[in-house]
Amino acid sequence: MTVSSNAEVGPAGELPAEQVVVAARMVREGRLISLASPRFPGMPLFPGHPPFQVLNYRTPRGIRVAGAQPWGPLNDAGLGYMAEYVMATSHSGAHMDALAHMTVADDMHWFGGGRADEHLTDFGPVHGDASKLPPFFTRGVLIDAPAFRGVDCLPKGSPIDAAEMEAICGAEGVEVRPWDVVVVRTGYMGLWPDAERMAAHQTAGPDISAARWMLDRGVIAAGSDTETFEVQPAPDPGPAGNPQPVHTALLIERGVYIMESLDLEELARHKVYEFLFVALPVKIRGATGSMVDPVAVV
């Protein structure tokens, strides 16, 4: 298992200041493109996660009936407020996996020396959890697989291998460099939120050769528009039959962050293949990821 000098943060924690400056200089138009779709109760999610829910906690009518105004007696202005519970996994909609999200082997280890027997409490992991997620302000690259293939959306279980990643970059006129964030479009979010249509296209994505291709180029994070990032079922699970070899290679072995359920449709429509990538994960102690609303700045 790889152990980094940034054991709880990974290579993204070593982003050089000069790379931040170079990324900032990429902005030419000042246009902001959101890479996330709205979240809502009943939204499509990976089946291993709990459903997303929003419930009222206080309403203007409710506080009057209950006499529960936090500022004392009913005011002449009739001031009220609304507050809510949001109950959800941190892996709802566009999100980033913390390093303490996936484990492997009998010792249930994760990147940077984390192990379930030592670092997993009843209130979540204490090593490599979401409170350690760094901010991202670096160059982003879009790899648009359906545009390259001339289709709207990749077919169910279609792998994107290293050779195709390289060919797409050539067609787009971009190259992947150290410190980049790579986002891979399959067209899946173009079907959002029609769960029935989406199910017919689950789940295309990078295979293990594509993961190694990204590692060879020094990326610090990678994302896609599907719930699993990598192609499922894995065409090359290895001798141990690992169902998610890409997560293992990137997140567990090298500390490269993975994002899922990104909305890359507007980037693709405008043929924006390189951009300033900005993401500010929410630092929640004990969480295994963070909902994010990343922005591509053009």
Describe each region flagged by the PLM.
Residues 1-298:
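Active-/binding-site microenvironments in catalytic and ligand-binding cores
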